């Protein structure tokens, strides 16, 4: 009985370690620096994780922290087809957090388009959010202006508290303090 319990605990611990490093990176040019455990990937970089596929032209991966710094023509697509595009981003493989810096475009699985800045894509909590202003465009041509937002990925719902302005396809304007 003790042996079975020991084997179970050992198996559980080893399984956790195996799944923590499931990051696959490909590129045309690869430079490895073993002394600091970093790798630099250039030209047509492709990264596959358990939850998304990321492409860019440059990536620097730190094996110790499992953080990837991405630059130039970044596109991240999750399994539900939510797409984020930017020119600078960081992906933390341990926390499953993808965050952009600067101008960012988000296209949701429902084909809504959002232009904003500094967007966080949290795979563990299934949330995309930003504390910066953003503009959401729907399929009918309506525009929603947010001071900040939170998008619940599994429910396809946007939430925001603060000044929210909606301009519909007929150019009517509505203002709200919160939206859900």
Model-derived segments and spans:
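N-terminal amphipathic/hydrophobic interface segments
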Residues: 19-180
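Positively charged n-region of N-terminal signal peptides that target proteins for export
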Residues: 1-7
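Bacterial N-terminal signal peptides
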Residues: 7-17
């Amino acid at each position: 009985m003790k042996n079975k319990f020991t084997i179970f605990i050992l198996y559980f611990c080893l399984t956790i370690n195996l799944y923590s490093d499931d990051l696959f990176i490909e590129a045309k040019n690869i430079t490895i620096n073993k002394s600091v455990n970093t790798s630099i990937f250039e030209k047509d970089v492709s990264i596959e994780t358990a939850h998304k596929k990321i492409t860019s032209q440059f990536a620097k991966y730190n094996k110790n922290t499992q953080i990837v710094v991405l630059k130039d023509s970044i596109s991240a697509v999750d399994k539900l087809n939510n797409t984020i595009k930017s020119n600078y981003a960081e992906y933390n493989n341990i926390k499953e957090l993808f965050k952009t810096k600067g101008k960012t475009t988000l296209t949701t699985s429902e084909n809504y388009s959002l232009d904003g800045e500094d967007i966080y894509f949290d795979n563990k909590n299934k949330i995309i959010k930003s504390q910066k202003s953003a503009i959401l465009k729907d399929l009918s041509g309506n525009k929603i202006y947010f001071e900040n937002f939170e998008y619940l990925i599994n429910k396809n719902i946007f939430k925001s508290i603060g000044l929210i302005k909606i301009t519909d396809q007929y150019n009517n304007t509505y203002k709200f303090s919160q939206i859900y």
